[in-house]
Amino acid sequence: MLLTETQKFDIFTSILDSSAEAPCAQICNEFHQGNLLDFNTVYNFGKQVDLLTIEIENVNIDALDRLEKEGLTIYPTPKSIRIIQNKATQKNFYKEKNIPTAAYFHFAYLEELKHSYHNSIIKFPFVWKAARFGYDGTGVKIVRTFKDIENLPQGECIVEKLIPFKNELAVIVARNHDGDVTSYPVVEMEFHPEANQVEYVICPARIDDNIAKKAREIALKVADAFDFVGLLAVEMFQTEEDEILVNEVAPRTHNSGHYSIEASNTNQFEQHLRSILNLPLGNTDSKVAGIMVNLVGAEGHTGEVVYENIEKILEIDGVTPHIYGKKITKPFRKMGHVTIVDKDIVKARKVAQQVKKIIKVISK
C-alpha cells in the first residue's frame, strides 16, 4: 500500500524483507531478502539507499544507529525506534514525559513476576505484555489465575492492572522534519476477544467531542516528545472515568489508518511519504465515514488461501476489498482488509457487520 504511493511520486524503491514471497517483491524496483534483526544484513542494505524508513519496528537498531552516524537519513529516527521497540522503555518514556499511561511493573524474567505475585505486589487480574516482538495481538495475555502465570513464556515483560475501559481509540499523527504536524480524526477500535486483533476500525469514533479533543492533544504531545518524523499511530484507552491513557505507539503506517485510503482526503501512506520527504502535509479530514474490517485467516484453515464470497461483497455499494497478496493462510493471519464508506456512520457500521459475516478467509 505504501509502494502504491511511491509510484505516484516516481520514487525508486528498494525493499528488505525476510520472506522471498513477500508481496512487495512484485511491486518495488529492487528486492532484497534477509533477516531484519541481523546487523550486517540491515547495515549493508542501508548503504545502498538515500533515505530509509521502516514498515515494522522489529529491526536491528544497532545497524540503524551506525548508518545514521555515517550520514544516512532515517525516519523515524533510530532513537525513537529503540524506545518504541521495548514496551518497558516505552512506558518509562511516557512516565518521564508526563504522558498519561496505565501503571505498570517491569520484570526481567518470569521468576521475578512469580516472586512479585507471591509477595502480593501484583494481583489478579492483570495484563501481561512481552517487552519485545509483540505484533498484531501476539505477546499480550490477560492473566486471571496462577495457572495462567505458569503458562506465560519466559523473558522480559511488563504487567499492567486490568483497567475497565469504555473504548480503545487511536490517533495517527504526521510530522515532518520542519516540525509541521497534523493528526487524523480519532478512530475507535474493536478487538477480537481471543486473538486480541483489531476486527473493526471506525472513523470517526463514536465519542464526545471533548474526549476526541483530549485524545488528539495527547497524541500530539507524544509525537512532540519523540521529536518524531513520519507517521505515528498512538493507541489509547478511554477509561470509565473518561481519562485517556496511552497504551502503545507504532512508528509507521498502521492498521488503524487503513480506512483512510477510501475515506480521507490524504491517505496515511501518502502522508507518511510527505512526512519523511519533508513535503507539505496533506489534508487529514475525512470525506465520508469509514470503517475497516480486518480479513484474517479463519480458524481451522492452513494452506493456499481462498477468499470465499468475495464476489458477494463486491455487490455492495461503498465496499472496497484490499487483498495483500499473501499465498498461504493460517488462523488469525492478516490477509487483507475491507473498507466500507458512507456518509452515515450508522449505515456504514451495519454494512461492515454484513461484510464480516459474508467473506471468509479459508484454505483450499
Where are these regions (language model features)?
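Structural motif corresponding to alpha-helix initiation and N-cap regions
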Residues: 35-39, 61, 110-113, 146, ...
